[in-house]
Regions:
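Short glycine-enriched, charge-decorated loop/helix-capping segments at active-site entrances
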Residues: 178-185
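SAM-dependent nucleic-acid methyltransferase catalytic core
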Residues: 4-7, 48-164, 168-178, 190
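Short, glycine/acidic-rich beta->alpha junctions
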Residues: 14, 189-190
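Helix-loop module immediately N-terminal to the HCX5R catalytic loop
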Residues: 1
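Conserved S-adenosyl-L-methionine
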Residues: 4-63
């Protein structure tokens, strides 16, 4: 895949997710987007050049007493009730590492609803977070939280630019149907 992408002037990823592909692309400019506001807010706080303490504060939730089903449910409720994007971003890291299989799923009311994961010793991914931070701090970037068909994501693109589309996947069966990456979900019609 990377040889096909090459070294674009601008690299646009409308379904950024973990940014795994972008972290392996050498572009001059990155436009990263995801419909999940919690994810994009996390990235914005993580790469804020004026705040070196974000990762450390995320670690405040990674205490042995918080690796417990009741504490998890309590912190998940706190996350769902909070409107403070900074606090939600810190808790989002905790939820991702303590929930079942690291899933991100929301109910129709917009509440994060993944159950407790029973991990033995979930760790703060501080090295990966620092690597992500340094990668994007050293490059021109935009992180957006808009619908994938929003024209602003693609404004000014031309020769030498790449748009990488890796949308959520069509379920293999009715029981595998999962498209609740954000409150509004992602329908089959949007995928095709």
């Amino acid at each position: 895949l990377l040889p096909l992408i090459g070294t674009p002037k601008t690299y646009v990823e409308p379904f950024a997710g973990s940014c795994a592909t972008a972290l392996n692309v050498d572009a001059k400019r990155y436009v990263m987007n995801d419909i999940n506001a919690d994810l994009i807010n996390l990235y914005k706080y993580l790469i804020n050049p004026n705040d070196d303490s974000f990762i450390q504060h995320c670690g405040d939730f990674f205490r042995p007493e918080n690796n417990d089903k009741e504490e998890y449910i309590s912190l998940r409720k706190y996350f769902n009730d909070s409107t403070d994007t900074l606090e939600r971003s810190r808790l989002f890291v905790y939820l991702n590492r303590h929930c079942f299989n690291g899933l991100t799923r929301y109910n129709s009311g917009g509440g994060f609803n993944v159950p407790f994961g029973k991990m033995k010793n979930p760790m703060l991914p501080s090295t990966a977070m620092m690597d992500f931070r340094m990668y994007f701090l050293m490059r021109k970037h935009i992180f957006a939280n808009v619908h994938f068909d929003d024209g602003r994501l693609y404004a000014g693109l031309g020769s030498g630019d790449v748009v990488y589309l890796d949308p959520p996947y069509v379920p293999a069966s009715d029981t595998a149907n999962f498209a609740s990456y954000a409150k509004q979900g992602f329908s089959y019609d949007e995928q095709v």
